[in-house]
């Protein structure tokens, strides 16, 4: 997703909204999401290293929700509606644009399909996906697998997708497709 998003950002004049970036905004200190998370998890969720602002330790939060399905469900019930609302609000700023790219890693799991007019699914082998996650997020192999396993399978996602972009190895495959579509 990141490679394709970066390509669109560089070569097309199309707004891009990323659900992960919005979620980071929604849990910054003194926001509603931040306060709710602290109420639920307590101060143990605060990153104590070089952190005078009281920023939430996202890696610790991720580890907690991977190990505890109740916590995972709670955080999803809190954040998914907030992210969706924020994404709709941000989209309204671009109402004069014909196209807006929404990057939503858990599109189907969070039930965000209704805010999309067309769904593009980025395909890559699980092993490559795992490798990219480890490199990008600086997480362990187990954490990468846990993250991947939280998602619907590619086969399930494919059923609900309009376009499949293969980001396995040859960039020319998906670049040509994007040029045609945009």
Stretches with model-predicted labels:
Residues 86, 95, 114-115, 135-181:
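Small-molecule kinase domains that catalyze NTP-dependent phosphoryl transfer to phosphate-bearing small molecules
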Residues 34-38, 126-134, 141, 145:
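An amphipathic alpha-helix signature
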Residues 14-27:
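Short beta-strand-centered segment that lines the nucleotide-binding/catalytic pocket of NTP-utilizing
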Residues 24-96:
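ATP-dependent small-molecule kinase phosphotransfer cores
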Residues 15, 63, 118, 162-163:
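Well-ordered beta-strand positions
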Residues 5-6:
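The feature captures the helix immediately C-terminal to the Walker
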Residues 1-2:
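Walker A/P-loop
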Residues 85-94, 99-135:
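ATP-dependent NMP and nucleoside kinases share a basic, alpha-helical "lid"
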């Amino acid at each position: 997703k990141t490679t394709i998003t970066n390509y669109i950002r560089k070569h097309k004049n199309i707004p891009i909204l990323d659900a992960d970036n919005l979620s980071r905004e929604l849990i910054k200190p003194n926001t509603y999401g931040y306060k709710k998370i602290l109420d639920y998890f307590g101060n143990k969720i605060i990153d104590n290293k070089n952190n005078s602002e009281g920023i939430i330790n996202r890696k610790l939060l991720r580890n907690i929700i991977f190990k505890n399905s109740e916590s995972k469900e709670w955080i999803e019930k809190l954040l998914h509606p907030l992210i969706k609302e924020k994404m709709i609000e941000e989209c309204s700023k671009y109402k004069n644009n014909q196209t807006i790219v929404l990057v939503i890693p858990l599109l189907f799991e969070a039930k965000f399909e209704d805010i999309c007019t067309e769904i593009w699914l980025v395909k890559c082998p699980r092993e490559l996906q795992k490798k990219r996650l480890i490199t990008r997020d600086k997480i362990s192999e187990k954490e990468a697998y846990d993250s991947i396993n939280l998602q619907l399978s590619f086969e399930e996602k494919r059923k609900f997708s309009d376009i499949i972009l293969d980001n396995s190895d040859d960039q020319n495959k998906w670049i040509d497709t994007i040029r045609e579509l945009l």
